[in-house]
Amino acid sequence: MHSTWQPAATIKQLKQRADILNQIRQFFVERNVMEVDTPAMSHATVTDVHLHTFKTEFVGPGYAHGQPLFFMTSPEFHMKRLLAAGSGCIYQICKSFRNEENGRYHNPEFTMLEWYRVGFDHHDLMDEMDLLLQQVLKSGTAERMTYQQAFIDVLGVCPLEDSMDTLKQAAAKLGLSDIADPEQDRDTLLQLLFSIGVEAKIGQQVPAFVYDFPASQAALAKINPNDSRVADRFEVYFKGIELANGFHELDKPQEQLKRFEDDNTKRIEMGLSPQPIDHHLIEALKAGLPDCAGVALGIDRLIMLALGYDHIDDVTAFPFPRS
């Protein structure tokens, strides 16, 4: 049976969405941040073990055997190539794709705002993002806490120092023993504790910025020069929903390449296929990435929260079931 042809969101809701997108663009115009447009597909993709990509194949002239292509999970790699080419501060509002969940807060194809500020570190970027959130959400000044403090305050355990057994005991108190007890990977266990135990307890009245994530979860962020246990990475939560993920961007090509290779090793150990590494990005880092910070923000979730709805379908014209 076919689903209805009509949009999930009303025209009134879509006009409200358009108004917020205009607000966001004006925010960056006022700060002289250039809007850019990068490919939705690439020959390479992310290696992160927690991200699942859509894959297709180009079979045009010169590619009789097919050229694998991946839909981008974010525009990060292409935008960093622009930064290395001298673009200066840039932002993009685009479609991103993740072959994962479909539901209240997830759609396989979603709208992302990503921006990079040359000369900023992650604290500077949190300051700027706080201003944007106050404007769009009509919220107060965000609260800030380290990843370590969030765990200690909410769960009574230290994510940087406590043993796996202690972390599993915390999971047991949340009724997660069946998932946590067999888990051997520390970061997977920490992410379980954070998503189930911490997220719902922070950022209820105003958005919460959580920063200084474990170095093992650095992804594309720099390691903190004053504490090698943590990375210059932050995430943003509001009313139990993850809104954004930001970095003081890593600019060392060999370290970034090693992280990608380590991810692929981990993927193989987990029974997942290794992913093709984006060597264009590595070459761009070799050419020189300016000191900068960047963040990716989920637009659909932001608009849903700003307008007081409880499902992203309420602010999306044609979500996955109707697409």
Curated annotation (Swiss-Prot):
Keywords on record: ATP-binding, Ligase, Nucleotide-binding
Keyword hit for ATP-binding: yes
Alphabetical list of Pfam families matching this protein: tRNA-synt_2
Binding-site list for ATP: 98-100, 107, 242-243, 298
One BP annotation, GO: lysyl-tRNA aminoacylation
GO cellular component: cytosol
Residues reported in the UniProt entry to bind substrate: 74-76, 116, 249
Matches recorded under InterPro entries: Aa-tRNA-synt_II (IPR004364), aa-tRNA-synth_II (IPR006195), aa-tRNA-synth_II/BPL/LPL (IPR045864), EpmA (IPR004525)
Top-level taxon of origin: Bacteria
Catalytic activity: D-beta-lysine + L-lysyl-[protein] + ATP = N(6)-((3R)-3,6-diaminohexanoyl)-L-lysyl-[protein] + AMP + diphosphate + H(+)
GO molecular function: acid-ammonia (or amide) ligase activity; ATP binding; lysine-tRNA ligase activity; tRNA binding
The EC number(s) this enzyme carries: 6.3.2.-
UniProt function note: With EpmB is involved in the beta-lysylation step of the post-translational modification of translation elongation factor P (EF-P). Catalyzes the ATP-dependent activation of (R)-beta-lysine produced by EpmB, forming a lysyl-adenylate, from which the beta-lysyl moiety is then transferred to the epsilon-amino group of a conserved specific lysine residue in EF-P.
Family as reported in the entry's similarity comment: Belongs to the class-II aminoacyl-tRNA synthetase family. EpmA subfamily.
HAMAP family: EF_P_modif_A (MF_00174)
PANTHER family from the UniProt entry: ELONGATION FACTOR P--(R)-BETA-LYSINE LIGASE, LYSYL-TRNA SYNTHETASE
Subunit structure and binding partners: Homodimer.
Protein name (record): Elongation factor P--(R)-beta-lysine ligase
Originating gene: epmA
